[in-house]
Amino acid sequence: MAVHAHPDDESSKGAASAARYVAEGVEVLVVTCTGGERGDVLNPGLAHDPAVLADLAAYRRTEMARAAEILGVQQTWLGFHDSGLPEADEEGVVPPLPEGCFALVPLDEATEPLVRLVREFRPHVMTTYDENGGYPHPDHIKTHEISMRAFEAAGDASQFPGTGEPWQPAKLYYHLTFHKARLVALHEACLAEGIESPFAEWLEGWEDKPEDAARLTTRVPCADWFATRDEALKAHATQIDPDGRWFHVPLETQREAWPTEDFQLARSLVPVGEGIEDDLFAGVRPDTATTDVSRSA
């Protein structure tokens, strides 16, 4: 079960590994917390399209359905409203979040439908964002909060009664999409091939934090699904500039420089070995697990 804030997040974070697991027979459910109603239209070709501007939420639901089809995942909505990303004015004053938005919903109220889904789908592995939301968008931070709360509560019959039989996932991971080691590897690969690196400016302003080095616990090989990832991302046409520089790095360059998607193991109720994992189901697979379970995520 991959818990995301907005439609398109599932295609920019963990998409290739999700597609790989689907190809291996794993059931993967993407949970999208909001409809992305307050997102901007980032594709210049659609920025003034009347059909898009008339009902962005409906347009993004169509995009999400297409991306899910490409990845092969199941997908459902929690039904909350996008909080938007407030920007400070010239005096540095940040406007309040809009009333009724996802970020302002009380924690247990926002968590209840996710607990219901966990108990219904019965995943063995969950993925979500870290405590910073991956980046400090209020909906991403809220997604982290409800994911952690649901992971801890779903197996406890005394919590959230009336939402199904208790079910305890075995592991929970944070996405580590944009960490320094990966960006450096891709940046250096671009330079070696004479390609303009889209990561140069990002790395110049990078602030190293000692604790970040320990975050990388799991690298899932999934290079064969990078093209699927990009196709799913481009399905979110309002959110992606198809001519953007991110798509200028050849897939083969990416595959050779960094052939994995990466995660941080945040919670585990199964034994964890030493070193870097190469499978989200390490310790949960029938051949290594303490209990014989089928695989779902």
For every predicted segment, state its role.
Residues 1-122, 264-267, 272-273:
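Active-site rim/loop-helix segments in enzyme catalytic domains that contact anionic ligands
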Residues 1-3, 88-297:
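Metal-dependent de-N-acetylase/amidase catalytic core
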